[in-house]
A protein has these predicted regions:
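Extended, folded cores of ATP/NTP-driven motor/assembly subunits in large transport
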Residues: 1-355
């Protein structure tokens, strides 16, 4: 019988400094969690709103700069509707809420996790000036949300602890939360009674990702109607919870530009159709950097699906829907526990290069 091992959460503590609740992972990197609203209504049909929200996060990346990792986590979970406690106590209000009480709906929450990386080149790696800059940058990010009229707040110590526990147990739709056993398999995880699978959207060994992606797509309903690129997640069958995890790491821009130039010369030295295509892509990226001030980043995207029953139907639905968007998922996701652990808030820095 295989020996069971204890799963250790990759955190060492939480503290509040200058009214900023900060938690630390095992490497010593420090993170905050911002809960923000998504200002775009599902059927708003407003293309400008999608671009505005996209530009907001572009500005956040530029404000933070080198040495940061950003995780945007969208939690979609099924909940049973309960009337609000502060509702009006009149006949029409009571009848209205009684009519909808108990109905299942999809609740959406958005969290932004910002992690400051500790330099590894020194024996004593903590730099108080970098830490002070991190706290100032968090204030700037909150200011960017406020300027756009978007509600955003820092989670306090208790809320951070509860959010991490909910993530570990994939439990976002019950008032009480408890940690469950995790059984790791090649193709999925079993957390308590739930079947969980992590789908990585990018395969670095194959060119299965569109070169240009808009923040929305258009569906044909007799007219061109813009919807969110992953709006199909709302209709995923046999699913209790979906976590869409997006990770962006901002490296040193000068070093990455030098690496890109070296890679271009390497491809130019071996002329064939595949290498010529790589050279064209690199030159296009260099042009965008020079003209529009774009940044070079490392990115990772994955979708975590969880359900009490068999989720193979949901996996097939998501895979087919992504294919319609021009995205072919990574077929080599056999490191399910590793992908799940790296999706935890503040732990994306541990992602391997092949993810």
């Amino acid at each position: 019988m295989k020996k069971k091992s204890e799963f250790e959460a990759p955190y060492i503590g939480i503290e509040t400094i200058d009214n900023t609740p900060i938690f630390y992972n095992r490497r010593g990197d420090y993170s905050v969690i911002i809960k923000c609203e998504n200002p775009i209504i599902q059927y708003s049909a407003d293309m400008d709103a999608y671009y505005d929200f996209h530009h907001l996060f572009t500005n956040i990346l530029k404000v933070l700069g080198t040495g940061y990792t950003i995780q945007k986590q969208d939690i979609l979970c099924k909940k049973s509707f309960l009337p609000p406690q502060n509702r009006k106590n009149d006949y029409l209000s009571n009848r209205y809420f009684e009519h909808f009480k108990g109905r299942i709906y999809t609740d959406i929450s958005t969290y932004l996790v910002i992690t400051g990386e500790v330099e590894r080149s020194k024996f004593f790696s903590f730099d108080p000036r970098r830490f002070d800059t991190f706290i100032r940058n968090i204030t700037k990010v909150l200011g960017l949300f406020a300027n756009r009229g978007i509600r955003a707040k820092l989670l306090n110590e208790n809320e951070i602890e509860i959010y991490i526990k909910r993530f570990l147990s994939i439990n976002f739709n019950q008032q009480t939360v408890s940690l469950k056993n995790i059984k790791a398999r090649e193709e999925n995880l079993i957390i308590g009674e739930k079947n969980v699978q992590c789908i990585s959207l990018v395969d670095i060994d194959e060119v299965n990702f569109p070169s240009i992606i808009k923040p929305y797509k258009e569906v044909n309903i007799g007219l061109r109607f813009p919807v969110d690129l992953l709006s199909f997640l709302h209709d995923t069958p046999s699913i209790d919870t979906i976590i869409y995890n997006q990770v962006i790491n901002i490296p040193d821009q000068r070093n990455e530009a030098n690496k890109l130039e070296g890679k271009k010369k390497k491809h130019k030295g071996m002329p064939d159709p595949a290498n010529d295509l790589c050279v064209e892509d690199i030159e296009r990226v260099q042009s965008d950097i020079a003209r529009e001030g774009q940044m070079l980043v490392y990115a990772h995207y994955n979708i975590i699906l969880a359900g009490l029953d068999d989720i193979s139907k949901a996996i097939n639905y998501v895979e087919t829907s992504l294919f319609d968007c021009g995205i072919i998922i990574n077929k080599q996701c056999f490191n399910q526990l590793e992908l799940f652990e790296c999706a935890l808030p503040g732990n994306a820095i541990n992602l391997n290069s092949y993810d």
